[in-house]
Design a protein with these regions (language model features):
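Zn-dependent metallo-beta-lactamase
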Residues: 1-47, 51-54, 237-248, 256-258
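Binuclear metal-ion centers of metallo-dependent hydrolases, dominated by the metallo-beta-lactamase
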Residues: 12, 102, 117-133, 176, ...
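Beta-strand-turn-beta hairpins that frame and shape the catalytic cleft
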Residues: 12-17, 30-37, 131-140, 159-164, ...
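Pre-active-site segment of Zn-dependent metallo-hydrolases
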Residues: 34-78, 90-91, 171-183
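Structural motif
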Residues: 35-37, 75-76, 102, 137, ...
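Active-site metal-binding loops of divalent metal-dependent hydrolases
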Residues: 41-43, 82, 108, 144-145, ...
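Metallo-beta-lactamase
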Residues: 73-85, 217
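Active-site-proximal loop/helix segments of hydrolase catalytic cores
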Residues: 145-212
């Protein structure tokens, strides 16, 4: 079965949301009305192509892409920042090469998309602390702290009324910067656990999920690249540490392409 058929066959009940991890830091959200929201899908070997001279096989893709660029219909595409495993420069044109999909991104991500051939009328520039209303949800853009390597990274809270789904973007555990997300108490949190390149590790993610009083946490940002090893993203750490640091939050481990329905 193709991933498109799999996705089309998922039926989401009213007051429910489907969350699909598509590998690395990428997710799809599918709504009751069959709208598809994509967040930071990484679908090619773009990072390896970009960095292989410096890192060798360190950023070689080690897991297959869940779907091909252009294979599925996406309504909204959100990019948290311009790093290649979040804004895929080799996939972005095909992702937007239709009459349906719009990209919401920061200025640097916009530049990458335009360089890839995307028309500006397919892109809307966004920044932290903005709020945008859509038919089925409200988008609340939250600050994140990715250090000096990226100062314009954003987090996203998708407020569907019955549930708030939080995608942190790449961030470290800086409670002052993350205060907005903590105050909004999203029920579902999608958090990185690689603990490198300015990101949360498993313990940080558990503490952060506990701060937000999240009911569900789906970890990501692991096992895509050879550099994701040991302290740089071992999911067993999350499995062991969430019961200790976030006892009221259920850890949901997904394999790439697997769906979880909340509600």
């Amino acid at each position: 079965m193709s991933f498109k058929t799999y996705l089309d066959n998922i039926k989401v009940k009213q007051n429910s949301i489907c969350v699909i991890w598509v590998g690395q830091a990428g997710f799809l959200l599918k709504t009751h009305s069959d709208k598809v929201i994509a967040i930071d899908p990484y679908l090619t070997d773009y990072v390896y192509r970009f960095f292989h001279k410096e890192y060798g096989y360190g950023f070689k893709r080690m897991t297959a892409s869940v779907f091909k660029p252009g294979e599925i219909e996406i309504d909204y595409l959100f990019s948290s920042h311009e790093h290649g495993d979040h804004l895929d420069g080799d996939a972005i044109f095909e992702l937007l090469n239709n009459n349906r999909t719009m990209l919401f991104a920061n200025e640097e991500s916009m530049k990458i998309a335009v360089e890839a051939g995307v028309s500006l009328d397919k892109i809307r520039q966004v920044r932290e602390d903005m709020a945008i209303g859509f038919d089925e949800f409200k988008l609340i853009i939250t600050p994140a702290d990715h250090g000096e390597i990226c100062k314009d990274v954003m987090g996203f809270i998708f407020d569907f009324g019955f549930v708030r789904v939080y995608y942190s973007g790449d961030t470290c555990y800086n409670k002052e910067v993350l205060k907005k997300a903590i105050d909004l108490q999203p029920q579902v949190a999608l958090l990185p656990i690689n603990g490198a390149f300015g990101n949360l590790n498993a313990e940080d993610a558990a503490k952060f999920a506990n701060d937000m009083r999240s009911k569900i946490c789906i970890p990501h940002h692991f096992w895509t690249f050879p550099l994701h090893k040991g302290e740089k993203g071992d999911p067993i750490d999350a499995i062991e540490l969430f019961p200790k640091y976030a006892p009221e939050c259920k850890l949901v481990m997904l394999s790439p392409g697997e769906a979880f329905i909340y509600g």
